[in-house]
């Protein structure tokens, strides 16, 4: 049975960043359910916008995005729609439009060969015994059993590691549903849509590489019905759909209290969305995935006396920032306050008409 310093479950942005930064300094194994190349297998349903905080992480790491990761077009504003109030406003935003699956594969490709990576793999079981973490996973057609001193859950909203560590922990969840359509709009755009009759979260649209992506986060019970109802409503705001080319869905976490942020215990750690590190106001998680990976890298390499306590303390600033997003979300999803903000015209950039 092979033993490692660190076992990382999941190679989204958080897991890939951590594996890259620990390479050559610790003996690392990393498991991921995505394939190494191509579009076969699992791909993360995601709008694919890189926020300024995520961009800053790449600046710190000296990384530049390859052209095949960047999508077309690049848009500098978000059309914000309040359906009930029939209000539309344009707010400046500095997102980079990316192909999310290509981005994830590129992040994995940066992991040095010294890290033992298993693509298209499935983690079957984890447990702690004799001060070690045991991991059973399936890859290359057969089951393998390894041990590790440290276990890292970078496995997203449905984190197996989080469920093992905190079996009674409950966090609010939504089903994120997206459909892709051939682009019909004469001028591509991003949008953020609020309709409290549909969801107490929000919906979105993105123009990307000749497609129009429409999606949102909805209650788990009847999300598909609510999604369809909202699509019908959006014709009043000049949204054009046609026949769906592709439909996709996944679970998304929605932190709503301080206790929703969980960092791990017993030499197991959670990073990215697995820890609840996702913005409640925008559902953006890449920047917090990268930041939490960098924080954990620092803790693991410094080897303080109590690693879990050190990681909890080191993420305090990040958790406070995310708690601020919870407060912001409550403001944005409060109909009266949102209507007042949008009607005030603050930060709105009117579009010139011919």
UniProtKB/Swiss-Prot annotation:
Disulfide bonds: none annotated. GO terms for molecular function: FAD binding. It holds the Pfam family FAD_binding_3. NCBIfam families: PRK11445.1 (NF008519). Belongs to the CbrA family. This is Protein CbrA. The lineage of its organism: Bacteria, Pseudomonadati, Pseudomonadota, Gammaproteobacteria, Enterobacterales.
């Amino acid at each position: 049975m092979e033993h490692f310093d660190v076992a990382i479950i999941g190679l989204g942005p958080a897991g890939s960043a951590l594996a890259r930064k620990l390479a050559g300094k610790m003996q690392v194994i990393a498991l991921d359910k995505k394939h190494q190349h191509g579009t076969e297998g699992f791909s993360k349903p995601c709008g694919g916008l890189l926020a300024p905080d995520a961009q800053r992480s790449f600046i710190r790491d000296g990384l530049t995005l390859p052209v095949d990761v960047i999508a077309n077009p690049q848009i500098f504003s978000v059309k914000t729609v309040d359906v009930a109030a029939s209000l539309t406003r344009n707010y400046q935003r500095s997102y980079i439009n990316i192909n999310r699956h290509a981005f994830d594969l590129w992040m994995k490709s940066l992991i040095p060969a010294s890290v033992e990576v298993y693509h298209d793999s499935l983690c079957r079981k984890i447990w702690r015994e004799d001060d070690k973490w045991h991991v059973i996973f399936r890859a290359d057609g057969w089951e393998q059993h390894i041990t590790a001193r440290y276990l890292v859950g970078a496995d997203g909203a449905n984190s197996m590691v989080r469920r093992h560590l905190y079996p009674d922990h409950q966090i609010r969840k939504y089903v994120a549903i997206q459909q892709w359509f051939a682009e019909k709009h004469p001028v591509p755009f991003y949008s953020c849509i609020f309709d409290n009759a549909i969801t107490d979260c929000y919906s979105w649209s993105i123009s990307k590489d000749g497609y129009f992506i429409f999606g949102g986060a909805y209650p788990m019970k009847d999300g598909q019905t609510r999604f369809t109802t909202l699509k019908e409503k959006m014709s009043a705001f000049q949204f054009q759909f046609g026949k769906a080319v592709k439909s996709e869905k996944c679970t998304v976490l929605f932190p709503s209290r301080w206790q929703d942020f969980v960092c791990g215990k017993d030499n197991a750690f959670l990073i990215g969305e697995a820890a609840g590190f996702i913005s409640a106001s925008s559902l953006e998680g890449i920047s917090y995935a990268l930041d939490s990976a960098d924080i954990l890298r620092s803790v693991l390499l410094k080897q303080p006396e109590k690693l879990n306590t050190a990681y909890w303390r080191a993420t305090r600033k990040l958790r406070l920032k995310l708690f601020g997003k919870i407060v912001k979300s409550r403001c944005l999803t409060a109909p009266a306050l949102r209507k007042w903000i949008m009607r005030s015209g603050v930060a709105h950039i009117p579009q010139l008409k011919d």
